[in-house]
Amino acid sequence: MTKGILGRKIGMTQIFAENGDLIPVTVIHATPNVVLQKKTIENDGYEAIQLGFEDISEKRANKPQIGHAAKANTAPKRFIREIRGANINEYEVGQEVKVDIFSEGDIVDVTGISKGKGFQGAIKRHGQSRGPMAHGSRYHRRPGSMGAIAPNRVFKTKNLPGRMGGERVTIQNLKIVKVDPERNLLLIKGNVPGPRKGLVIVKSAVKAKAKAK
């Protein structure tokens, strides 16, 4: 069954394995989440648990938010997300979910909002090749052909310059190197989406058949 927790990306560092290998890791600070609601097939058409992360003052919350959190005997939350595929029988409303639901060696998927890059060209945004850099070249970094003459228009799928980043991105099959329940930290091998202090969702990997090497 799926396990999941909400946290914030602290940044990257490196640790040494027992055999001396240097491992680059991303540190995620996941303070205890609170189960705000259990979604059931009878009431909602699907099964999921709703987690809340980071308290906010009641002054900054509206009445529906305050009432929803009160059912779980907790304060209103800044971030609320659902974890589908979880065994809802293992959870109760108001229960805390901590980093110790994971263990070293677990394979997870991490979802976050990618860093915003602003307005970028087709080469940086889509990875296109540039044109010839010779003096007589007609273009260097332009998008290139807009398409054939016959349609008499540019198709929506044409890769063009525009805003880059700020999108929901999931990196799959990352390995948890270390779990620190005392400090509510997860150390995950490799990089995860988003800037420092960005919200991330750590869930059991969907496609992992075996533990990553």
UniProtKB/Swiss-Prot annotation:
Matching Pfam families: Ribosomal_L3
GO biological process: translation
GO MF annotations, alphabetized: rRNA binding; structural constituent of ribosome
Disordered: annotated segments: 122-147
InterPro entries: Ribosomal_uL3, Ribosomal_uL3_bac/org-type, Ribosomal_uL3_CS, Transl_B-barrel_sf
Function of the molecule: One of the primary rRNA binding proteins, it binds directly near the 3'-end of the 23S rRNA, where it nucleates assembly of the 50S subunit.
Family: Belongs to the universal ribosomal protein uL3 family.
Subunit-structure text: Part of the 50S ribosomal subunit. Forms a cluster with proteins L14 and L19.
Stated name of the protein: Large ribosomal subunit protein uL3
